[in-house]
């Protein structure tokens, strides 16, 4: 009898038993003591309808974010993604994260990635962008390594107001290789202090807006950087309203692209943004897609400047990224194309307004801001000592509340990081306020 995924028919089994000279499978395994045998406990086969029903019952044990008011940000955000984005991005023609080495059969994917790079450059104000990195944290680490190659120095100063998990990844990448990571503090506004920068500093890394939601003063940061390169970690949607880092003289811009049409996740499927100046392109990691003309004179797209990559000697390559998250970049390209400049500005504006309304309502019931600097769509505020317990109980009311910060910043005990995006309604905010009382 044939079974799906089991290649051996009854005739195959009989032929194998005859070949080795035994009459049955039981005889084949007769040398194994009965006491050592156990049943596989495999259930009887089931039809598709009953399997689907069982899987649906199991899936209903999960909680859906669609049912929650989400005030939890800190690098991953609940946003609305138009249905057309996945209708296009999930077409079988596109559905691979593999590198499009064969340009002649990958023109659609290559064009989409080229357009992604172009839109990232427009958002960041930079001259060249690659076709994606793994995520925001590893993009920052690669930016630091790039700064070492460009300057010949081995020290990076990173603001403590950069996402704590990004800083952890940075240390993992750098310290075992002998590089130095120094953290710079922050002031009462929530903005970075740069007292640690010296002539041995290869680069300064700041976040804009930073982990606390505060909009960093990049003019100040640039003025304090001296000869060090300026690395700016961005939240891409915010750049629809804020001045791009390139206009402040940033040398490398990196970030997490999850806000650009990707779902919320817990440790998976992500997108690293990476952009820089054209003069540094030979030291930029990752894939780069270029536009050219084929033999017939038609516009064509292909991977370019591959001598930076692992096609050359490993020791000379700028990075050794393999099958990267190209499909995530494609989704981001579709999302940005669908939204357009005005749509992205509207998403950013609604997020900004929702966060500021939330902050005002929290202040009305006694919750004060922790920092005085201007914020985008996240902010830190003071909370009572028992807030972590309240935070967990909020989940029972379908609320993912603001994030308690003491675990990440011991000096910020009894504070929380609140986030609001374009999907947060006044009703959601009132629901949170009631749970906070």
Swiss-Prot record:
<dbReference type="GO" id="GO:0009116">
    <property type="term" value="P:nucleoside metabolic process"/>
</dbReference>
<dbReference type="Pfam" id="PF02347">
    <property type="entry name" value="GDC-P"/>
</dbReference>
<dbReference type="InterPro" id="IPR023010">
    <property type="entry name" value="GcvPA"/>
</dbReference>
<dbReference type="InterPro" id="IPR020581">
    <property type="entry name" value="GDC_P"/>
</dbReference>
<dbReference type="GO" id="GO:0019464">
    <property type="term" value="P:glycine decarboxylation via glycine cleavage system"/>
</dbReference>
<dbReference type="InterPro" id="IPR015421">
    <property type="entry name" value="PyrdxlP-dep_Trfase_major"/>
</dbReference>
<dbReference type="InterPro" id="IPR015422">
    <property type="entry name" value="PyrdxlP-dep_Trfase_small"/>
</dbReference>
<comment type="function">
    <text>The glycine cleavage system catalyzes the degradation of glycine. The P protein binds the alpha-amino group of glycine through its pyridoxal phosphate cofactor; CO(2) is released and the remaining methylamine moiety is then transferred to the lipoamide cofactor of the H protein.</text>
</comment>
<comment type="subunit">
    <text>The glycine cleavage system is composed of four proteins: P, T, L and H. In this organism, the P 'protein' is a heterodimer of two subunits.</text>
</comment>
<dbReference type="InterPro" id="IPR049315">
    <property type="entry name" value="GDC-P_N"/>
</dbReference>
<protein>
    <recommendedName>
        <fullName>Probable glycine dehydrogenase (decarboxylating) subunit 1</fullName>
        <ecNumber>1.4.4.2</ecNumber>
    </recommendedName>
</protein>
<comment type="similarity">
    <text>Belongs to the GcvP family. N-terminal subunit subfamily.</text>
</comment>
<dbReference type="InterPro" id="IPR015424">
    <property type="entry name" value="PyrdxlP-dep_Trfase"/>
</dbReference>
<dbReference type="GO" id="GO:0004375">
    <property type="term" value="F:glycine dehydrogenase (decarboxylating) activity"/>
</dbReference>
<keyword id="KW-0560">Oxidoreductase</keyword>
